[in-house]
Design a protein with these regions (language model features):
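Sec-dependent signal peptide recognition
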Residues: 2-7
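A sequence/structural signal for flexible, mid-protein segments enriched
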Residues: 18-298
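C-terminal motif of bacterial Sec signal peptides marking the signal peptidase cleavage site
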Residues: 13-16
Length: 298
């Protein structure tokens, strides 16, 4: 009898763990998602899609037949032209991508805004000020060590930061007729390390793209040293310093934090709100201007 009582109690405990909860999830109201990064060396363009709910099984689809008005300093320049391209997705299904183009390059210092309307969605608006390119000065390139086919270099460069809030992206490109990409580099520069979210002393930034602000050197000449390794290949190496808008800087940082958060177990990390400057929608309208310097490696 005693054993039967224990068995009955344990059976009830396990049975009570199987609970089905019906969640009353409100239907997701789709909004326009706009992604557009203006660069002074390319014509104005944007991709437009729509949002999906967290529990929505449907895929993200690009939106066609939208009216996209482009303004420069508040003056209407005209409407974007819609272009469609077809490709096959990972399920071997024919998919279409709609891109909106405007045949004009943006100008540094100008404010560009979009007003976008579509009969199925709430109208959205966004604007960005295109930053001016900052001249890059390479002070020296030093060969630190050489072993077999590997060479360790250090490049020291500088630029003059304007006395206002500025945001930068640093990349190091390699290329020849067969290869084209961005090389990893490392630096112990405090601005890069702080902007990457690392606060510990003695830390080193490592990656192929550094985003940083001018909080530590506003309005002064800034000098940075980076280390990198090259191998015995006939490649050209170019240092690339890009002035980016605050909207682009904030969006990319929040997007990285969102992706990093996905690597954790469910509910283990704090949710990350991805930045947007699209009124009544999602996505980003950002801008940038770039200066480059071809390196002569000793």
């Amino acid at each position: 009898m005693k054993n039967f009582l224990y068995f009955f109690i344990f059976s009830m405990l396990f049975a009570s763990c199987d609970i089905v909860v019906d969640l009353d999830i409100p239907e997701h109201e789709r909004v326009l998602v706009v992604n557009s990064i203006l660069t002074t060396d390319s014509m104005i363009n944007a991709s437009i899609s729509h949002s999906v709910g967290a529990f929505d099984a449907s895929s993200i689809s690009y939106v066609n037949n939208a009216t996209v008005e482009v303004y420069e300093d508040g003056v209407l320049l005209g409407e974007m032209n819609e272009e469609v391209s077809f490709s096959y997705n990972y399920m071997d299904e024919l998919d279409s991508t709609y891109v909106y183009n405007f045949n004009q390059n943006p100008v540094a210092g100008k404010i560009y805004s979009y007003e976008i309307a579509h009969p199925d969605y709430e109208a959205v608006r966004a604007e960005t000020t295109v930053p001016a390119a900052v001249k890059l000065n390479v002070n020296d390139v030093t060969l630190l060590s050489e072993q077999d086919d590997e060479k360790h270099y250090r490049v020291r460069f500088s630029f003059n930061d304007a006395p206002e809030d500025n945001f930068y992206r640093l990349r190091f490109r390699y290329q020849n007729e067969y290869y084209d990409g961005f090389n990893d580099f490392e630096s112990n520069d405090a601005s890069m390390i702080s902007s990457a979210g690392v606060q510990s002393d003695g830390a080193t930034f490592y990656g192929d793209e550094a985003l940083f602000d001018d909080e530590m050197f506003n309005g002064t000449e800034k000098e940075i040293s980076i280390d990198f390794f090259v191998y015995n290949k006939p490649l050209e190496y170019t240092l690339e310093l890009t002035s980016v808008s605050e909207s682009y800087y904030t969006y990319i940082r929040s997007l990285r934090a969102h992706y990093d958060n996905q690597d954790q177990f469910i509910f283990a990390g704090e949710p990350v709100q991805v930045f947007t400057n699209i009124e009544n929608g999602l996505g980003v309208l950002g801008s940038m201007s770039v200066d480059t310097m071809l390196l002569e490696l000793p």
